Amino acid sequence: MNYGKKSAAQKRNSLISRSSMMGKRARVSFIRLLFVSLIALCIGVTCLGIGSFKGVIDNAPDVDDIDIMPLGYATFLYDDQGNQIRKLAAPDANRLPVTLEQIPIELQHAVVAIEDERFYEHNGIDVRGILRAGVKALTSGDFSEGASTITQQLLKNNVFTNWTSESTQLERFTRKFQEQYLAIQVEKKTDKDTILENYLNTINLGAGAYGVQAAARQYFDKDVWD
């Protein structure tokens, strides 16, 4: 009788052991399946992201076809004695061109310090600035801090001239990615001085003045080099 009980107990323990083993194998199989699924999902998302990013880049303007110079300048009319009698300028073209040599070095340094302090160090995009802005956006929900370099701003104003009509975040992100891509390409073929000169002749400085020379005339009634 005891042997019968012992045999039954052994069978019961064997069944429990097998059941436990099968449960453990099922859990291991589930974990493996979950792990493989997560890897596949990550690969899929990565491929989708790369494909989307490539599509955005492929649709960007060709760097050889763009012009980073300002789009409009003021026109002056003179009488037969050479005296200026009238100034003609569209609302967004009140601009008087000057060379970088005519712009005081102190003004150049001030603009760089405010707009893009690592202008002479980066290759068109400021990775540190992008990371800083990203961290601030994630931690505080504040997306107001920009990370656009002087080169990017120049492209925004002189190449992506329709940015003011953007109505969706997708349009803004698409343009921003294209700006970053083109900024790197532009800096491969254009020196920093040329970029800065065009920027200082482009920027809107208020009161209808575009560029530092127009602003000097507008606010101080003198030339920027005076």
Predicted regions and their residues:
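N-terminal type II signal-anchor transmembrane helix
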Residues: 1-78, 118, 138
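Peptidoglycan glycan-strand catalytic modules in the bacterial/periplasmic cell-wall system
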Residues: 2-7, 72-74, 78-226
